[in-house]
Amino acid sequence: MKRIAQIRVLALATLSAGIVCAPLLQAQEDPTLDATRRVFGYIGPGFRAVRRGPDGSYYVLAPPPPPPAAPVKSFTASKVPPPPSPAVLIFDSRGKELRHIPAQTRPGEVVSPSALDLDTSGRVYIADQSANSVSVYTASGTLVAHFLVPEPTQIVALPHDQFAVCSANADRLIAVYDLQGKLLREFGEMEDLSDDPELNHRLNAGHLAADKAGNLYFAFRYLPEPTVRKYDSASGLLLDELSLTTLDLQPMAQSARQEIARADSGKPVNPHEIISAFGMDPETQEFWLALGNLLIHFDNADNITASNRIYTTYAIRMVPNSILVEKDHLLLSNDPLGIYEFARSSASVHRSE
């Protein structure tokens, strides 16, 4: 059943107007949610994703810290080493780094990982868009499966030794595979946003998440009207769709569609990112959407319970590209700002943008 959310939140009205004429307008006094602390201090540039393992450890997809610089004997002869490739960095609950996955990378095993997830047994799933592959590791870092998957951009572990991916060039939003690399099913109708097939695939990119029952949630990154779909992962049936289409959001949607229409005239297109991050509580089915630095909290009946503008511990405006929902708090992450802890509930502080 499709739901059209009736939102009358001042923060949303301000956001939609600001996208059209941001230099001319200042945000109103919106409720503010400030970070309580920064975690995993050196994580920042190159960050991709963070997950919590069943053992309580954190798995962070990001470049490891560079090795100590060797003494430079000659300025002319010195070379700047290339930045390290992203890996899965594992931290304990206190933030102490424990190990990396893979510990020793084989040629072609991991090229440019784009996403990761963990299943209930602790296996680590890594999607590598550049290498057109998915790798699966044990919690200790042993490779147990590696197979070709076309341009995977998102990955979610599912029950029954299956996993779901989003691919950059697929004709369906979601594909489900088993651990032998066999494609089991594809589902999710793409939105028709452009006559250019390549651009239309790009505009149908999204964020993928799952709840404890294995239902899949797809949040469109670029669809002008913020939209989240819920699918049954076993059948591919569409169970629910939340679309924010009120008058408050029309200026934002109109601006996004105007940018997409530029492609028809042959001009370079820079699509507006509408939903920058999506996070799901797998136990309660509550979820959070980030529209710019506006964080919106929904209950499991798609009702808005809170909306706040978010800031780091140094009062820096934050636009998250990852949301990890935990029992007592949220971890919001941004490349290059890093990973910050936030309360799940709203704050009473107000700050002008």
Stretches found by the model and what they are:
Residues M1-K2, L237:
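Short amphipathic alpha-helical segments with coiled-coil-like heptad repeat character
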Residues K2, A22-L24:
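A composition/secondary-structure signal for short, hydrophobic, low-basic-content segments
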Residues K2-A11:
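Bacterial N-terminal signal peptides that target proteins for export
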